[in-house]
Amino acid sequence: MTEYANRSARGRARTDDEAQLREQLLSALERERRDAALGLVDIADGGSLQPSTVARLAGRATDDDAADVRQFAVEALGLAAQGADGEGAAETAIRTALDDDEDWVRAEAVVAASRAAPDDEATLREALNDESGYVRRNAVVALSKTGAASQELLTERIKSDRHPAVREYAADFLREYAADTAEAVRILAAVLAREPEAFVRAKAAASLGDLGTDRAEEALERHGLNDRSDDVRRSAKRALATARGVDPKQIDAGLDDPGAPGGGPGSRTGDGPDGPGGGPGGPGMAGVTDGLTQGQRENR
């Protein structure tokens, strides 16, 4: 899931010979099967796979006991399905993987589905209903990258999704789908003021800079430049420079000044979790997380 902010631990295979890797998929050792699937990801990313290899990957993607093997087999199939895929074996296995018990396999399957059938908007939209925030995040990214997202869809995710990574990418892509610029700026300004997660606020700041209206600049000055997070302040400074068409060095950020009144949970004047309109459960922001632990996130 390299395009979707998940690390794919490539480069572990001891060979780049497709036939050898195909045979290694039958190994009794989970580690060898996983490394074989990863090796085939690299090969598929650089070209196509033979139908016999696709067929064996399809079996690993749906029947392997190890979730890691299934995940990386699905990743390889998503790349292989962009070329000749052995009479639809790749797409069939990917669809099966969308119902896998493991969150990360389903999340990978969303990416693979967007590659194998980018026009299948219904499948990607269905993934927005998945219980896992990481699956929903990948659905938001896939819909946005395939041109099937909308301002309404992204705004709804920003307002109601409980997983911060979903809100992060919805805020990031909203700039590209802002049919109603004023409304998009209003939503992103609210995110910058009220969203509890700094990385979501940083993406909102970047989007505001690209939209570049007077209201966007006001939000960046009032909330972004006074945010308690260094990352958000840097993002806001760059965004303000983008909006004004100047070098970021020309922006007098005033980062050492006290935060502006009404800065929300991210500003240096709104330290409490229940600041003006913000914090978990606050109006318009989902504010709490679900899904996997930090250790599980980093493990991928």
Language model features with spans:
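Short inter-helical turns and helix N-cap capping residues of alpha-solenoid HEAT/ARM repeat scaffolds
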Residues: 28-30, 65-66, 101-102, 131-132, ...
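Short amphipathic alpha-helical patches
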Residues: 59, 136, 162-166, 177, ...
